[in-house]
Amino acid sequence: GIMVWQDFMFACAMYPGNPEFLENVKQEAVDNVIRLRNHPCIALWCGNNEIDAAWRGWGWKREYTQQQQERIFKAYTDVFHRLLPEVIEKYTDGDDYWPSSPMSGPEIGDHEIRPANRGDNHYWGVWHEKHKFEEYEKNIGRFISEHGFQSFPEFETVRQYTLLEDYDIESEIMSAHQRSGIGNLRIREYMGWYYQVPEDFGQMLYMSQVLQARAMRIAMETHRRHMPYCMGSLVWQHNDCWPVASWSSRDYYGRWKAQHYFTVKSFADLLVSPIEKDNTLQIYMVSDRLKSTSGKLTVCVLRLDGNGVVKEFKKQITVPANTSTVIWKEAVDGLLNGEKKEDVVVHVLYEDKTGKKYTNNYFLAKQKDMHYADRKSVV
């Protein structure tokens, strides 16, 4: 089933602390807690999004005197460390409450630690700080409660708000539907690192989704491989409130972006996840099942030109319940058997005893460096 992280509607701003406002907040919180409290899917109630982190480290304090800072922060603690937890305690049967996301603990001063050994993290090194996708592996917290990457919606959606003369991501109309000041630049930068950057407008829209899907697939698989140390991965974001370039996996019209397909696969109850470490390919099996499962693992190294199998391995395995396990590994040089990394793909298949199949493909080189054969296919 689906568990819900239920935010109160406070985000990225400091709020008043006068008695009238606090009473208004209290009554609204009571109404909504009573409205939602009987839903068994609610995992926790969170006071706000990113206010603790912002007040600590985003430079918000600089324009205020020490006295003003103390007054503003008292208003903050009155709402999120006193009023809201009191409402939760009174009107629920012991539901969990988290004052702000991200934090390292529930007390005042328990600011986010990166990467965290406790609490939750918002990891935006990939995107805002221009970390490479591989950095996800080096930034593992206990619960990654926000991470994401932008893409454009598909061409069919873009046609809803553009004319032919607008078919440029830097056009006035396209810019109006891109509300991140660094959005187009980041997409181009990252695309240049991993893919060939297309000049065609439609291909750029498409490749932005491929890029986003790759980023989020790596993130989701990384977080799951580190189970049980990391036990949460919340993707920003699911959908849109208008047709726009954004971090969503479904656009305003509900059309799935490439990322959404990978989300379904990456969050399946069983995940087969290959990764290269120290010139060795490791195959992880990640299970959310409460019982162990047995089946057959097949690892196949295929030439991209279609001229046969380079290496194939088959093994009967048992996947332990509710954890992540390295189930198979092999030196990359042995896998290649004299072939170049750019000429092959590693296809991994796990088939359980019921016949259900879980697959993944792993490339040993960047996509822009792969030697894909020109099949002269016309679609």
Predicted regions and their residues:
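Beta-strand-rich binding/interaction modules
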Residues: 281-329, 340-351
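Substrate-binding clefts and catalytic carboxylate motifs of secreted carbohydrate-active enzymes
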Residues: 45, 79, 86-89, 98-108, ...
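Short acidic/His/Gly/Ser-rich catalytic and metal-binding motifs that mark active-site loops
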Residues: 5-7, 12-14, 53-58, 243
